[in-house]
Protein backbone atom coordinates (compact mmCIF):
# COMPACT_ATOMS: atom_id res chain seq x y z
CA UNK A 1 0.00 0.00 0.00
CA UNK A 2 1.22 3.45 -0.86
CA UNK A 3 1.91 5.77 2.07
CA UNK A 4 -0.27 8.88 2.08
CA UNK A 5 1.65 12.13 2.26
CA UNK A 6 -0.07 15.16 3.74
CA UNK A 7 1.71 18.38 2.88
CA UNK A 8 -0.80 20.99 4.05
CA UNK A 9 -4.07 21.30 5.88
CA UNK A 10 -7.20 23.05 4.71
CA UNK A 11 -10.86 22.75 3.91
CA UNK A 12 -12.77 23.16 0.69
CA UNK A 13 -16.30 22.26 1.75
CA UNK A 14 -19.09 24.56 0.61
CA UNK A 15 -22.64 23.65 1.63
CA UNK A 16 -25.11 23.74 -1.24
CA UNK A 17 -28.89 24.00 -1.09
CA UNK A 18 -29.42 20.24 -1.32
CA UNK A 19 -26.93 19.59 1.50
CA UNK A 20 -28.60 22.30 3.60
CA UNK A 21 -31.98 20.59 3.09
CA UNK A 22 -30.46 17.25 4.14
CA UNK A 23 -29.04 18.84 7.28
CA UNK A 24 -32.38 20.43 8.17
CA UNK A 25 -34.25 17.14 7.70
CA UNK A 26 -31.64 15.33 9.79
CA UNK A 27 -31.82 17.88 12.61
CA UNK A 28 -35.57 17.30 12.86
CA UNK A 29 -34.93 13.61 13.56
CA UNK A 30 -31.83 14.03 15.69
CA UNK A 31 -33.37 13.24 19.11
CA UNK A 32 -34.93 9.99 17.88
CA UNK A 33 -31.73 8.94 16.11
CA UNK A 34 -29.63 9.73 19.18
CA UNK A 35 -31.90 7.60 21.37
CA UNK A 36 -31.63 4.66 18.98
CA UNK A 37 -27.83 4.88 18.75
CA UNK A 38 -27.58 5.15 22.54
CA UNK A 39 -29.72 2.02 22.97
CA UNK A 40 -27.54 0.10 20.49
CA UNK A 41 -24.40 1.33 22.24
CA UNK A 42 -25.62 0.24 25.67
CA UNK A 43 -26.67 -3.16 24.33
CA UNK A 44 -23.29 -3.70 22.64
CA UNK A 45 -21.42 -2.75 25.82
CA UNK A 46 -23.54 -5.05 27.97
CA UNK A 47 -23.06 -8.07 25.69
CA UNK A 48 -19.41 -7.43 24.84
CA UNK A 49 -18.37 -6.91 28.47
CA UNK A 50 -19.51 -10.48 29.13
CA UNK A 51 -17.94 -11.95 25.97
CA UNK A 52 -14.37 -10.66 26.19
CA UNK A 53 -14.69 -8.06 23.42
CA UNK A 54 -12.52 -5.04 24.23
CA UNK A 55 -14.60 -1.85 23.88
CA UNK A 56 -12.88 1.52 23.53
CA UNK A 57 -13.66 3.42 26.73
CA UNK A 58 -14.90 7.00 26.60
CA UNK A 59 -13.18 9.53 28.84
CA UNK A 60 -15.16 10.39 31.95
CA UNK A 61 -15.22 14.06 30.99
CA UNK A 62 -17.01 13.46 27.68
CA UNK A 63 -20.53 12.73 26.53
CA UNK A 64 -20.70 10.49 23.48
CA UNK A 65 -23.11 10.99 20.62
CA UNK A 66 -22.57 7.31 19.73
CA UNK A 67 -21.93 7.95 16.05
CA UNK A 68 -19.22 5.26 16.20
CA UNK A 69 -18.78 2.12 18.26
CA UNK A 70 -15.12 1.29 18.49
CA UNK A 71 -13.59 -1.97 19.65
CA UNK A 72 -9.99 -3.15 19.85
CA UNK A 73 -8.93 -6.35 18.15
CA UNK A 74 -5.54 -7.95 17.69
CA UNK A 75 -5.62 -7.47 13.88
CA UNK A 76 -8.15 -4.88 12.74
CA UNK A 77 -7.70 -5.43 9.00
CA UNK A 78 -8.24 -9.18 9.31
CA UNK A 79 -11.19 -8.54 11.63
CA UNK A 80 -12.78 -6.14 9.11
CA UNK A 81 -12.24 -8.64 6.27
CA UNK A 82 -13.81 -11.47 8.27
CA UNK A 83 -16.77 -9.23 9.15
CA UNK A 84 -17.12 -8.24 5.47
CA UNK A 85 -17.11 -11.92 4.50
CA UNK A 86 -20.11 -12.34 6.84
CA UNK A 87 -21.92 -9.39 5.22
CA UNK A 88 -21.11 -6.76 7.86
CA UNK A 89 -19.22 -3.59 6.98
CA UNK A 90 -16.76 -2.17 9.49
CA UNK A 91 -14.98 1.16 9.38
CA UNK A 92 -11.29 1.67 9.98
CA UNK A 93 -11.46 5.28 11.18
CA UNK A 94 -8.10 5.43 12.90
CA UNK A 95 -5.78 4.55 10.01
CA UNK A 96 -2.91 7.07 10.21
CA UNK A 97 -0.71 8.43 12.95
CA UNK A 98 -1.08 12.04 11.91
CA UNK A 99 1.69 13.15 14.26
CA UNK A 100 4.13 11.65 11.74
CA UNK A 101 3.20 14.27 9.12
CA UNK A 102 5.10 17.57 9.54
CA UNK A 103 2.16 19.65 8.28
CA UNK A 104 0.02 18.31 11.12
CA UNK A 105 2.62 18.28 13.88
CA UNK A 106 4.33 21.65 13.81
CA UNK A 107 5.58 21.31 17.41
CA UNK A 108 7.12 17.86 16.68
CA UNK A 109 5.37 16.09 19.57
CA UNK A 110 4.89 12.33 19.75
CA UNK A 111 1.61 10.59 20.43
CA UNK A 112 2.47 6.98 21.28
CA UNK A 113 -1.11 5.84 21.89
CA UNK A 114 -2.00 6.75 18.33
CA UNK A 115 -0.06 3.79 16.95
CA UNK A 116 -2.18 1.49 19.13
CA UNK A 117 -5.37 2.87 17.56
CA UNK A 118 -3.88 2.59 14.07
CA UNK A 119 -3.14 -1.11 14.69
CA UNK A 120 -6.16 -2.22 16.72
CA UNK A 121 -9.21 0.10 16.56
CA UNK A 122 -12.15 -0.87 14.36
CA UNK A 123 -15.68 0.55 14.34
CA UNK A 124 -18.69 -1.72 13.99
CA UNK A 125 -22.15 -0.65 12.77
CA UNK A 126 -24.00 1.51 15.29
CA UNK A 127 -26.42 3.56 13.22
CA UNK A 128 -30.07 4.30 13.70
CA UNK A 129 -31.25 2.25 10.70
CA UNK A 130 -30.14 -1.13 12.06
CA UNK A 131 -32.94 -3.62 12.67
CA UNK A 132 -32.97 -5.83 15.78
CA UNK A 133 -31.97 -8.82 13.65
CA UNK A 134 -29.04 -6.87 12.18
CA UNK A 135 -27.89 -5.76 15.63
CA UNK A 136 -27.96 -9.36 16.85
CA UNK A 137 -26.07 -10.51 13.74
CA UNK A 138 -23.39 -7.88 14.45
CA UNK A 139 -23.10 -9.01 18.08
CA UNK A 140 -22.92 -12.71 17.24
CA UNK A 141 -20.40 -12.18 14.44
CA UNK A 142 -18.18 -9.84 16.48
CA UNK A 143 -18.09 -12.35 19.35
CA UNK A 144 -17.20 -15.28 17.07
CA UNK A 145 -14.48 -13.40 15.20
CA UNK A 146 -13.10 -11.89 18.41
CA UNK A 147 -12.79 -15.40 19.87
CA UNK A 148 -10.74 -16.38 16.80
CA UNK A 149 -8.50 -13.31 16.47
CA UNK A 150 -8.21 -12.19 20.09
CA UNK A 151 -7.60 -8.84 21.71
CA UNK A 152 -4.38 -6.81 21.83
CA UNK A 153 -2.21 -7.55 24.83
CA UNK A 154 -0.86 -4.03 25.34
CA UNK A 155 -4.15 -2.20 25.94
CA UNK A 156 -3.56 -1.73 29.67
CA UNK A 157 -0.77 0.75 28.97
CA UNK A 158 -3.27 3.08 27.27
CA UNK A 159 -5.52 3.66 30.24
CA UNK A 160 -3.32 3.18 33.28
Locate predicted features.
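PLP-dependent aminotransferase class I/II
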Residues: 1-160
Amino acid sequence: AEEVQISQIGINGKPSEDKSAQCLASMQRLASWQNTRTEINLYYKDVFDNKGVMVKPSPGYSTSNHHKFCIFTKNKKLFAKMMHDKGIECNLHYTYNFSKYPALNVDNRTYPNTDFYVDHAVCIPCHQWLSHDEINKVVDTVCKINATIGVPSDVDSLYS
